[in-house]
Design a protein with these regions (language model features):
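C-terminal motif of bacterial Sec signal peptides marking the signal peptidase cleavage site
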Residues: 18-21
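Short histidine/acidic/glycine/proline-rich micro-motifs that form metal-
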Residues: 55-62, 90-94, 122-124, 159-165
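Short, conserved catalytic or interaction motifs in soluble domains
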Residues: 24
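Serine-esterase "nucleophile elbow" of acetyl-processing enzymes
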Residues: 28-92, 102-110
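Bacterial N-terminal signal peptides that target proteins for export
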Residues: 1-10
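Alpha-helical cap/lid subdomain in secreted, periplasmic
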Residues: 75, 100-229
């Protein structure tokens, strides 16, 4: 049977439009699937909140987001393809009292799965009472756990300058040991281990670590953090 040319042309156009329509639907489906996958990946990442002072903030570094220990920790996590996002909530000059006042607002901004608390250094430099520092740190821990009962917590220990006297330095050292035991949380005995007091690993002020110093701090933190991931 011979099909008229007009009918043949009509059938050809219909077939072409049908094919294009199928391709477009396939592309839309693929695009939607990719978009959904991307959104799912983003929403399934857990948050690690670093809450501290200028050490956490990366004071004095050219680019704290990459050279600070929080940024370096994120790079380590990404290299291992782990589903975690590091959030830097460091504030230069922060004391434990300031942190205790600020924490509620910070933890309202996003869910917290792992909480790394690094505060106390400014208390020690100012010679504030160790008992008050302990009270403030406990307040922070209580607020975080009340908001997120299943949160995993790391307490970053700090040491007071030796010129504060043995009585004070011992009392300050024991603050972190006591809190870690009381709250059953992970402890980094001294977050500046291998960095504090070493001139070439600190900036001119002798207090804030250089980029190289931050690399060492990141490794110190990783030894404890990695077991919680």
């Amino acid at each position: 049977m011979t099909i008229p040319k007009m009918k043949l042309t009509t059938l050809s156009i219909f077939a072409l439009l049908f094919t294009i329509g199928c391709q477009q639907n396939g592309e839309k489906t693929a695009a939607k699937t990719t978009e959904t996958t991307t959104k799912t990946t983003a929403t399934t990442k857990k948050n690690i909140l670093f809450f501290g002072n200028s050490l956490t903030a990366g004071y004095g570094l050219d680019d704290a987001s990459t050279a600070g220990f929080v940024g370096l920790t994120q790079q380590k996590i990404d290299s291992l393809n782990l589903p975690y996002r590091c959030i830097n909530a460091g504030l230069s000059g922060e004391t434990t009292a300031g942190g205790n006042s600020r924490i509620e607002w910070v933890i309202e901004q996003q869910p917290v799965d792992i909480f790394v608390l690094e505060l106390g250094g400014n208390d020690a430099l100012r010679g504030l009472k160790a008992e008050e520092s302990k009270k403030n740190l406990q307040g922070i821990l209580d607020k975080v756990r009340t908001k997120y009962p299943s949160v995993k917590i790391i307490l970053s220990g700090m040491e007071a300058p030796r010129n504060m006297g043995k009585t004070y330095t011992t009392a300050f050292h024991n603050v972190y040991l006591t809190l870690a035991k009381r709250n059953n949380i992970a402890l980094i005995p001294f977050v500046l281990e291998g960095v504090g007091g070493i001139a070439e690993l600190n900036q001119k002020d002798g207090i804030h670590p250089t980029a190289e110093g931050n690399k060492i701090i990141a490794e110190t933190i990783w030894k404890v953090l990695s077991s919680l991931l």
